[in-house]
Design a protein with these regions (language model features):
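Conserved alpha-helical scaffold segments that buttress catalytic/binding sites
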Residues: 1-112, 116-207
């Protein structure tokens, strides 16, 4: 078992939220993925993160700490990471996610791990530099966002139960609203709202 399994199974563990994003089933222990679901932590497949940031963005929006394993970035002519993978996020996708990480409202710590520092490929070093540039751009943009926000409210009725969604009028981002305390609202996507209208409520909203 790896370090993550040990953290999640320790009695002293006090993680309120944890998201494992971009996993590939054949590269992860089945027991770990099963454990993540048992403790109601979120897992998102690599396939769900490709081509668009919409499904993964809500997990970054209020993240306090984000760690990036460079194994999640695809390698081609020369290894980008110390454990290179042929499948992974491409260059444009990883830069888009770095910007989303920087846009987090609560980001305090960010770490990049397993970058192949011994790579002789100039493109690999350019990519890691651009990734950090997009991270900083996201942070700078977040600092310009207004402190006071207004929201549009959307109510969905399922089996006589009302579920409220909020849309930030400035950013266009969506939240599942639990009461009036904005800190308890759950970041979500427009797709979550559309699915709820069809009677498919994301189970993480009920935890």
């Amino acid at each position: 078992m790896n370090y993550l399994h040990k953290i999640l199974t320790k009695k002293e563990a006090s993680l309120r939220n944890f998201h494992l994003l971009g996993y590939q089933r054949h590269l992860n222990e089945i027991a770990l993925l099963k454990l993540m679901k048992e403790v109601d932590f979120d897992v998102l497949r690599l396939a769900d993160m490709m081509n668009t940031t919409e499904k993964a963005e809500p997990f970054f929006r209020r993240a306090d700490m984000v760690t990036l394993n460079c194994d999640a970035v695809e390698s081609f002519s020369e290894a980008f990471s110390t454990n290179p993978q042929i499948n992974g996020l491409n260059r444009r996708e990883i830069c888009a996610y770095m910007k989303e990480i920087g846009l987090s409202e609560n980001l305090k710590t960010f770490g990049v791990f397993n970058f192949n520092v011994y790579s002789e490929s100039a493109l690999n070093h350019q990519l890691i530099a651009q990734m950090l540039w997009y991270l900083i751009e996201g942070i700078n943009i977040q600092r310009t966002h207004p402190k006071e926000r207004s929201y549009d409210t959307f109510v969905v009725l399922i089996d006589n139960r009302e579920f409220s969604f909020k849309r930030d009028t400035f950013s266009g981002l969506w939240y599942f609203a639990k009461g009036n305390d904005m800190k308890k609202w759950i970041p979500c996507s427009r797709e979550d709202y559309e699915n709820t209208k069809r009677g498919e409520l994301n189970k993480r909203f009920l935890i």
